């Protein structure tokens, strides 16, 4: 009898286990960034009582066991809207959580979450929870983002693609947006094949969104005291009513600055040595007007549309008194330059969440830019220049994403076209130019996660057609090129808090119009430049190994370049207008670099920040004075920054960096270090925000000092710019206005978190 009972019990247990199913999925935020520690609850469909619960791992993945054919899952995370999903399959795909905000009248609520989150290939910075939101413009923030350098390059080498609210944008457009309207910035150093192969990584930038039926506005003024003066005034209006949100910012800047450049050139000839030195002081004045407008419309739960506009109008004046010496003979002259420029850029986007596993999106944009510059040099004979250009750029991208049991699939098609016309006048020598360029292509990417392992592979195809011509050189470029760019990313979870990864990809750097145009451009009394129509695009193969443990990330990258484009000086025996040094871009067949980087995010009580370091070793050889010259001097870079909440109304921040100098291809840079200090204080119940910043406190930024050697010419540059400055910014928050009588309330869960 006991045996029979035992067999029955075993049979029932086996039946239960056989009937059980394992439900799996992945949770991401609105920017497809994996969300760890999200609560996943299995609820009873009849009365929503809790059956069991789990949390997602650091990659946003969860597994929960169920004995029912139909299941109700609830996803919750503090600061995000609860998400419910009924499922009958084992794989629920990707769950996208939507963030909420809290508005409490008369109460100052301070969040305690960290400002920086790190994963194997991404650095996420919460700008809205950092002093960075008060710095000025988006470009001021980017200079202080871990993983980026002060000139907007990736720390591990290469230029990123900037994406604002899903639209590819430029640094010029980002300079129009106040930092106070930025919510989050993500640096992705190993992106998929979706974005341009001309850039190595992607920087995602997201603006803020208000609660429904709310209007807010802010007025700010920033003054920069350096050798001269700069003043920036910005007005921001952010509004959301029902399903439509609008963001408008207008700004005006007045700039007055001075930069001192000292250039030396030494030419070693068989019979003599020619030494030239030039000191140029550039006194600049400028007036800039910026405008940015963004509109988002939630058509329904699945569909949304958006519109963006960026406008920029500027007028600049430069006066450059110059002293040039060649073999003891001095020549003093001045140059005056006037510039007028305006740019208008618009884009529309549409997003359709077809169902929980499929998404379709479309983006189209158009940009028009016009520039007109005049110049005068009081040398003998007098030189007058006049240049004008008009640029039209249009593009579109259609993307489709779906999550399947066998893999996640992303694919799309894209195209863009650019046309420009213009003219350049040097005294009586005139050159008219016309360019047409078209880029079309497609991409697809597959990704799969299984047993702590992640695999993503993709392929991008681009075809580029160019027609470049001038009235003096005729049609000097008429070409069509096809390129395929493979992409592979592999990740493995070693423990709950650590992972390792490998990524392989390729990028391309195409020569610009000025690189290809054989026409002359005059530098100074002894130098001129020409383009090289024979230039080939540079293809770079990138291999990266990464390791991440909690708040520490380290990577080693090997970049191999084929046909690297470098502009070099060459001595010509036959002079042109008494000028014998010709600068011309050429292709270097082979060059490579190894870059090792490390980022650590720390938190010490009220102080949190990050420590960043990198080591770069180039491998390139050139000819100098008849011998093979190796340019392989390594360089070190180290930076540390932090913010310290002194009280609930004040904060102190610092950031410093050291660059040991070293070779960048053929340019040997000098060492440099900087220190910036920032103090922020809120006044009158957060109505006023005062920010005081000291940039380059010790005036030690020599980042533009370099020496280059090639063939029989040695040239150097020493720049003394307006890097040391005092910034005083005062912002006035005009407050928030409810647009209807329905009060917004924060959930208890959210309040408990803050």
Residues covered by each model-derived region:
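Outer membrane beta-barrel strand-and-loop segments of large Gram-negative receptors
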Residues: 393-397, 441, 536, 542, ...
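Face-selective signature of the C-terminal outer-membrane beta-barrel domain
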Residues: 288-316, 335-471, 493, 497, ...
């Amino acid at each position: 009898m006991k045996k029979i009972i035992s067999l029955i019990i075993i049979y029932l247990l086996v039946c239960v286990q056989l009937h059980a199913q394992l439900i799996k999925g992945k949770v991401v935020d609105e920017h497809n960034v994996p969300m760890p520690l999200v609560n996943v609850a299995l609820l009873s469909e009849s009365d929503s009582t809790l059956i069991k619960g789990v949390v997602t791992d650091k990659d946003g993945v969860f597994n929960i066991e169920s004995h029912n054919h139909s299941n109700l899952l609830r996803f919750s995370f503090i600061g995000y809207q609860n998400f419910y999903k009924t499922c009958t399959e084992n794989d629920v795909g990707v769950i996208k959580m939507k963030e909420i905000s809290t508005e409490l009248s008369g109460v100052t609520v301070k969040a305690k979450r960290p400002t920086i989150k790190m994963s194997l290939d991404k650095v996420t910075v919460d700008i809205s929870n950092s002093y960075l939101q008060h710095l000025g413009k988006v470009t001021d923030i980017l200079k202080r983002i871990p993983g980026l350098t002060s000139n907007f390059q990736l720390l591990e080498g290469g230029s990123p693609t900037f994406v604002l609210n899903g639209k590819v944008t430029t640094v010029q457009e980002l300079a129009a947006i106040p930092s106070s309207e930025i919510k989050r910035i993500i640096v992705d150093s190993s992106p998929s094949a979706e974005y341009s192969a001309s850039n190595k990584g992607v920087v995602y930038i997201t603006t803020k969104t208000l609660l429904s039926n709310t209007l807010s506005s802010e007025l700010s003024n920033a003054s920069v005291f350096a050798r001269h003066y700069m003043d920036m005034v910005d007005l921001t209006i952010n509004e959301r009513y029902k399903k439509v949100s609008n963001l408008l910012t207008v700004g005006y800047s007045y700039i007055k600055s001075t930069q001192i450049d000292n250039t030396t050139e030494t030419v070693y000839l068989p019979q003599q040595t020619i030494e030239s030195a030039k000191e140029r002081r550039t006194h600049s004045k400028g007036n800039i007007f910026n405008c940015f407008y963004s509109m988002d419309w939630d058509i329904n739960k699945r569909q949304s549309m958006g519109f963006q506009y960026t406008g920029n109008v500027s007028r600049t004046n430069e006066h450059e008194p110059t002293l040039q010496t060649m073999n003891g003979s001095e020549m003093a002259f001045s140059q005056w330059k006037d510039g007028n420029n305006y740019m208008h850029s618009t884009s529309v986007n549409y997003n359709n969440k077809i169902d929980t596993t499929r998404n379709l999106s479309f983006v189209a944009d158009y940009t028009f830019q016009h520039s007109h510059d005049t110049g005068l040099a009081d040398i003998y004979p007098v030189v007058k220049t006049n240049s004008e250009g008009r640029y039209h750029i249009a593009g579109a991208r259609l993307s489709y994403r779906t999550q399947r049991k066998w893999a996640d699939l992303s694919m799309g098609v894209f195209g863009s076209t650019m046309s420009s016309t213009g003219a350049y006048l040097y005294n009586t020598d005139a050159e008219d130019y016309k360019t047409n360029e078209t880029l079309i292509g497609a991409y697809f990417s597959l990704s799969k996660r299984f047993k702590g392992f992640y695999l993503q592979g993709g392929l991008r195809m681009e075809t580029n057609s160019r027609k470049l011509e001038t009235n003096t050189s005729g049609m000097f470029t008429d070409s069509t090129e096809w390129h395929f760019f493979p992409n592979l990313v592999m990740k493995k979870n070693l423990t709950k808090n650590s992972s390792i990864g490998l990524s392989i990809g390729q990028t391309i750097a195409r020569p610009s119009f000025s690189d290809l145009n054989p026409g002359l451009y005059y530098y100074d009394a002894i130098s001129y430049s020409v383009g090289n129509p024979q230039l080939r695009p540079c293809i770079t193969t990138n291999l990266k190994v990464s390791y991440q443990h909690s708040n520490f990330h380290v990577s080693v990258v090997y970049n191999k370049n084929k046909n690297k484009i470098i502009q070099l000086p060459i001595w010509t025996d036959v002079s042109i207008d008494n000028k014998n040094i010709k600068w011309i871009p050429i292709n270097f067949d082979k060059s490579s670099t190894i870059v090792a980087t490390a980022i650590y995010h720390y938190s010490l009580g009220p102080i949190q920040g990050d420590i960043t370091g990198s080591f770069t070793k180039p491998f390139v050889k050139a000819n100098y004075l008849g011998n093979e010259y190796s340019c392989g001097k390594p360089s070190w870079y180290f930076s540390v920054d932090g913010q310290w909440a002194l009280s609930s109304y004040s904060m102190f921040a610092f950031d410093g960096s050291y660059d040991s100098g070293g070779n960048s291809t053929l340019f040997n840079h000098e060492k440099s270090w900087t220190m910036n200090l920032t103090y922020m204080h809120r006044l009158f119940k957060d109505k006023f925000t005062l920010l005081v910043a000291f940039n380059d406190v010790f005036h030690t930024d020599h980042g533009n000092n370099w020496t280059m050697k090639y063939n029989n010419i040695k040239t150097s540059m020493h720049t003394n710019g307006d890097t040391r400055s005092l910034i005083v910014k005062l912002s006035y928050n005009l407050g928030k206005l409810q647009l209807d009588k329905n009060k917004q309330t924060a959930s208890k869960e959210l309040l408990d978190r803050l």
